[in-house]
Each structure stands twice: as C-alpha cells, then as structure tokens.
Amino acid sequence: LVYVGRLSAEKQIERIKPVLNALPDARLALVGDGPHRQQLEKHFEGTATTFVGYLAGEELASAYASGDAFLFPSSTETLGLVLLEAMAAGCPVVGANRGGIPDIISDGTNGCLYEPDGADGGAASLIEATRKLLGNDIERQGLRNAARSEAERWGWAGATEQLRGYYRQVLETNLT
C-alpha cells in the first residue's frame, strides 16, 4: 500500500492504520514529509509502515508503480493531483467519496471509493474498499488499466480546468 503526499493533519493519514490491522500481510509506504511526521511515526509504531521521505522524478514514479493500491484517506480534498499521478503509474486508488475525488474515481471501474463518515471515522468502509481492490488480481489489473486511461483523459489541463471551475463556483456564490 502506498500514500504519497504531505504528512499533515488535514490529510487524515491516521485513517490507514485500521487497514493495516485488518490486513496483517499488508505493508504501507508513506512517501513525503511534513509537520505531522513525528506524530504519524508514533501512531504507526508496531505496524509494517515505512516512512520513505520525499521522492521525485523516477523514484516517485517507481514508488507509485510498486504499489498494489494507493490509499488517499483525506475527505477534504477538492482535487488530489496525486490521484492522477498514481493512476498514470497504474496504481489503483482507494479514496474518500467526498470533494473532487469522485469526479476522478469511478467506484469499481478505475479505483474504489470509501465512505469517510460514521462512528468509526470510515474505518470499516476503508478496510472494505481496500480488501475489494486487493482481493482479485485479475480485477485489480483491470482497475490499473482503467486508471491509466482515466489519467490520460484528464491530464494536467483537465485537472487544472476542474479546479478553476470550483473556484468560479465559489466566487459566483459569494458575489450573489
């Protein structure tokens, strides 16, 4: 399992730990750095988690490509460009069914969505979505291929235009 991004509280990376507890053979690579790293190191202590640090270029592409799944637990993202990076590398995504994420991820087609709400903070849904993605090699390969195709369709121009659209909506709402 792979997470790439800033290690900060708003990314809700702690939500991944129940997945590791439920899937004892799973290993997690946290790629990136940030102000929340020390807290995360304590939180994930005793799990099969590696704090990789910052990567770029071919090393980052290799990290994405080596993952069976990219876990993106944040429920507050307007558009996670790292999702497109993961998908372009053929790493299927498990992401929250919130914000701009469902605009990119079609559940069961090019990745899996989880419901981040609930008394358990979405843990059961995240575990179920991750199990679903990891459970069948043939289906996962189909998700990989569809993820690559979707990333090609979006490209950076499409992602940027979507973000501009969100800003236009906010401005129009606030001006009226």
Indicate where each model-derived feature is located:
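Conserved donor-binding/catalytic core segment of Leloir-type glycosyltransferases
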Residues: 1-11, 17-21, 29
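Nucleotide-activated donor-binding/catalytic signature segment of Leloir-type glycosyltransferases, i.e.
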Residues: 38-58
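Short alpha-helical donor nucleotide-sugar binding micro-motif in glycosyltransferases
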Residues: 54-55, 62-67
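Aromatic "clamp/platform" in nucleotide-sugar-dependent glycosyltransferases that forms part
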Residues: 75
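Short hydrophobic beta-strand element within catalytic cores of glycosyltransferases
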Residues: 92-95, 105
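C-terminal alpha-helical cap of glycosyltransferases
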Residues: 132, 156-176
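A short, well-ordered alpha-helix in the C-terminal region of glycosyltransferases
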Residues: 139-153
